[in-house]
């Protein structure tokens, strides 16, 4: 560590005070730097997220983030990373220095796990979804919304426990001007249609994002890809997701189809109903329909199962090492990226105005989609005793190779197939996963009729600030 780094750490330590002793930087996000630290009072390791000055100087952001951080201290769930403390301290320059103290989790993010494995067996993926849904149910009961559910914000511990992190940061981010240097673009791949259009975000928005995560875990690809964040957001608003592989059970495909409905009023309304639905599917049953009498009970915390133990063995808790500080010029690079994205938006608006391709949020008549069967050929015998991770497919941030295309469809339920018979009770065994997965993308034209200016509003709804995946 250079003398300059040591001096900077010492200055930061003075602001944080004697209750926490900084060790080293373990991560950087668009809004903050994360330090590993010792909680001297409680004798435990913690993660301290230090907000960047450009955000803590924004009063509207500060008010929102303060409210969310203080509310998060009251969240008590094994499946949500705990928030221990939040403080604001004036620095010598007269600015407000903000930091939040959180539970330090020795685990691997779901994003890293999927990057390595490609996809997960159905039973493991459903286990992840049920645990995450239960964590969301606690958040939603407090009338709060996470707003940024994605694999990068889901940690898996060595004993298979799933924990949601980065709670409450996206809401505060909406207060920051879009052109501020150092911003990063929100995660378009997991954004709900209403969030992409700048409409009201509710608990059902988190359910949509969790549905996208579930789709990706089992299909080995995201439902929507594109050349840019804008094109992905438009796909979330207008296109029906491609059908999931038929190797996935009908009841699980139906579950994901309900979660990915465009109309938030027709999805599971909150984490509690989602947890109940996933629990039913794990027992081999069809998911109950949202807002029915079967969904009135409170979901019980999922008990550790064989798949939970297997999940812990698959996850690889990261070795905690010191991370280099970002280069001073990194903010300029991000600023250029924002400028490029805005240029894409302007071009999209011009194109929309000349071709009639606009937004439409009204339900369209359902047509019968062409059924495309995806064949999976295992290279090893299926086993119920141990899962051997496959060779992961190549993953891409936005685009993926198209091997099969679906005809245009206006049905938002194309991922949901009605099973003709009741599925047998699950034995909760871990299936063997194929080592090679055909990957497909839907090619669906956008046909809409809302005002052209809505394109900018829709994209503005996307540009939330979030942590790095």
Swiss-Prot record:
One of its GO terms (molecular function) is transferase activity, transferring phosphorus-containing groups. It comes from the Bacteria. Its EC number is 2.7.11.1. The active site is at 148 (proton acceptor). ATP binds at residues 26-34, 49. Residues 430-443 have a biased composition (Polar residues). It catalyses: L-seryl-[protein] + ATP = O-phospho-L-seryl-[protein] + ADP + H(+); L-threonyl-[protein] + ATP = O-phospho-L-threonyl-[protein] + ADP + H(+). Residues 20-281 form the Protein kinase domain. Keywords: ATP-binding, Kinase, Nucleotide-binding, Serine/threonine-protein kinase, Transferase. Residues 365-384, 399-413 have a biased composition (Low complexity). Residues 286-307, 359-454 are annotated as: Disordered. InterPro entries: Kinase-like_dom_sf, Prot_kinase_dom, Protein_kinase_ATP_BS, Ser/Thr_kinase_AS. PANTHER family: MITOGEN-ACTIVATED PROTEIN KINASE KINASE KINASE 20-RELATED, SERINE_THREONINE-PROTEIN KINASE NEKL-3. Belongs to the protein kinase superfamily. Ser/Thr protein kinase family. This is Serine/threonine-protein kinases PknA. It comes from Corynebacterium glutamicum (strain ATCC 13032 / DSM 20300 / JCM 1318 / BCRC 11384 / CCUG 27702 / LMG 3730 / NBRC 12168 / NCIMB 10025 / NRRL B-2784 / 534).
């Amino acid at each position: 560590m250079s003398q300059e780094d040591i001096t900077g750490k010492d200055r930061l330590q003075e602001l944080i005070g004697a209750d926490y002793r900084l060790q080293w930087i373990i991560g950087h996000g668009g809004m903050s730097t994360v330090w590993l630290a010792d909680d001297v009072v409680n004798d435990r390791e913690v993660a301290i997220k230090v907000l960047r000055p450009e955000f803590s100087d924004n009063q509207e952001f500060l008010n929102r983030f303060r409210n969310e951080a203080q509310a998060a201290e009251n969240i008590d769930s094994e499946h949500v990373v705990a928030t221990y403390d939040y403080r604001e301290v004036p620095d010598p320059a007269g600015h407000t220095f903000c930091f939040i103290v959180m539970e330090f989790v020795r685990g691997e993010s779901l994003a890293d796990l999927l990057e390595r494995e490609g996809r997960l067996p159905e039973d493991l993926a459903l286990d992840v979804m049920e645990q995450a849904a239960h964590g969301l149910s606690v958040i939603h009961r407090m009338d709060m919304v996470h707003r940024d559910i994605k694999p990068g914000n889901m940690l898996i511990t060595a004993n298979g426990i799933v924990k949601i992190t980065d709670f409450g940061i996206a809401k505060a981010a909406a207060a920051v001007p879009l052109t501020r240097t150092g911003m990063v673009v929100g995660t378009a791949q997991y954004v709900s249609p209403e969030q992409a259009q700048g409409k009201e975000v509710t608990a059902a928005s988190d359910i949509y994002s969790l549905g996208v995560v579930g789709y990706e875990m089992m299909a080995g690809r995201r439902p929507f890809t594109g050349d840019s964040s804008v094109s992905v957001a438009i796909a979330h608003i207008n296109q029906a997701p491609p059908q999931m592989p038929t190797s996935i059970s009908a009841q699980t495909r139906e579950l994901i189809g309900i979660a990915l409905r465009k109309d938030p009023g027709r999805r599971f309304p909150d984490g509690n109903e989602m947890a109940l639905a996933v629990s039913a599917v794990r027992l081999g049953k069809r998911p109950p329909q949202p807002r029915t009498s079967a969904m009135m009970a409170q979901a019980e915390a999922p008990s550790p199962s064989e798949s939970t133990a297997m999940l812990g063995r698959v996850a690889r808790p990261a070795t905690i090492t010191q991370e280099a500080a970002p280069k001073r010029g990194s903010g300029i690079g991000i600023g250029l990226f924002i400028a490029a994205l805005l240029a894409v938006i302007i071009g999209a608006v011009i194109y929309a105005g000349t071709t009639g391709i606009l937004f439409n949020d009204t339900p369209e008549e359902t047509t019968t989609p062409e059924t495309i069967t995806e064949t999976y050929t295992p290279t090893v015998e299926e086993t119920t005793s141990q899962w051997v991770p496959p060779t992961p497919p190549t993953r891409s941030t936005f685009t993926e190779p198209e091997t099969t295309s679906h005809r245009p469809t206006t049905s938002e339920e194309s991922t949901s197939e009605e099973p003709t018979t009741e599925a047998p009770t699950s034995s909760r065994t871990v299936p063997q996963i194929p080592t090679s997965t055909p990957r497909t993308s839907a090619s669906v034209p956008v046909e809409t009729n809302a005002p052209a200016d809505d394109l900018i509003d829709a994209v503005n709804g996307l540009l939330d600030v979030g942590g790095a995946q």
